[in-house]
Amino acid sequence: MTMSLIQACRSLALSTWLLSFCFVHLLCLDFTVAEKEEWYTAFVNITYLEPEPGAAVAGSGGGAELHTEKSECGRYGEHSPKQDARGEVVMASSAQDRLACDPNTKFAAPAHGKHWIALIPKGNCTYRDKIRNAFLQNASAVVIFNVGSNTNETITMPHAGVEDIVAIMIPEPKGKEIVSLLERNITVTMYITIGTRNLQKYVSRTSVVFVSISFIVLMIISLAWLVFYYIQRFRYANARDRNQRRLGDAAKKAISKLQVRTIRKGDKETESDFDNCAVCIEGYKPNDVVRILPCRHLFHKSCVDPWLLDHRTCPMCKMNILKALGIPPNADCMDDLPIDFEGSLGGPPTNQITGASDTTVNESSVTLDPAVRTVGALQVVQDPDPAPQEGEAIFTTNSGQEPALSSDSDISLIMALEVGLSDVELSTDQDCEEVKS
């Protein structure tokens, strides 16, 4: 899995997550708006004349005290018109009919067609039936008081189908207070006015289920993306580690094929004007072991070997030693090919910093005996001491100037060397192909 594909999957998953979040958020807003409930409170103002103790007749006016109480304790029904209502409060004529569940319930309505308000306790039948029975008796309004649990609570009563009469609910204490006054034959007048508008929001079960499912799906998508991402990341890391191990093995093979020399006293590497090791920035001393790379740069063996294992390139010119030696990461054919660059060229290497770049041969395709190398009719003997001895011919090509040829014999010697190397390279390639097959 390439990095571009992983990034594309990451972007797709992130976009999906954001779109899902916005979609769920909008739907949640819609569900919230759909579940809003609007209801109104009602001010209940009652007025009555309470007789003084010892008075013969209640409401006669003599010795009576006028009481007025007003509180925002009522709540309009769901289908009730939101308007004012006034009238005398009455209950059912008989105690058995006070629940007003029977359509034939009779109320003690005042004479002369005065407006009256029916007071009915909760229970035994629906609010709709109670309100309809009072409406059929020409009540101006219906007041239902709560009974039982949560006596101080009022609700928005549903009474669909009976929408032409004002209907409110009051708490049980207020209702029982009015009932006690009526049982004492005290006339109670009630005035109902509109109170505060309220907007209540409810969370429906449908919206909760939908949001929960959407959230779960969103989390599953995110979790699946995370699992996919980390699996691909793990596979990529493993592949990278395997590649590094293969490259490390190939680097070890390549390092084993590179020439190693021991600096001796009198070698030109020990001279003060010779370049230092580019890794440790120290000069070369006798008995120092150096590694010679295919690019003819040399370094201390202990300095350059760790570098080559990690980077597989020359610290100076960045030449890849695997490519220079023709060793792929899984090469098997190159294991038995010893490399001796100095002997193949007939002399010690020349450092590039000094201005002389030597002409090199692809050592990975040349197999020569370490002691004796035969090139055509030319035999070159390698002395254990790599320093040039008197009488030896060292063939190098300087990048700044061409070496002068002293005679025709020198030209013949160079041509023989080139032809011989070509023949040896061809035969070596054939042997390599046979080993592979």
Curated annotation (Swiss-Prot):
Residues 80-182 form the PA domain. The keyword Transmembrane helix applies. It is a single-pass type I membrane protein. Residues 1-34 form the signal peptide. It is found in: Membrane. It holds the Pfam family PA. This is RING finger protein 150. It comes from Mus musculus. The gene is Rnf150.
